Curated annotation (Swiss-Prot):
Organism per entry: Populus euphratica (Euphrates poplar)
Keyword Chloroplast: yes
The protein, known as: Photosystem II stability/assembly factor HCF136, chloroplastic
Record's subcellular location: Plastid, Chloroplast thylakoid lumen
Purpose: Essential for photosystem II (PSII) biogenesis; required for assembly of an early intermediate in PSII assembly that includes D2 (psbD) and cytochrome b559.
Keyword presence, Chloroplast: yes
Gene Ontology annotations of biological process type: photosynthesis
Domain notes: A 7-bladed beta-propeller torus, about 54 by 55 Angstroms, with a depth of about 25 Angstroms and a central pore.
Length: 26
């Protein structure tokens, strides 16, 4: 991926719904 979504592309599509919120989770 690119930019801020770099890490989110690694996780399942289901988790992508969290988007930026996942940053605090991880």
């Amino acid at each position: 991926g690119t930019g801020i979504t770099e890490e989110f592309e690694e996780v399942p599509v289901q988790s992508r719904g969290f988007g930026i919120l996942d940053v605090g989770y991880r």
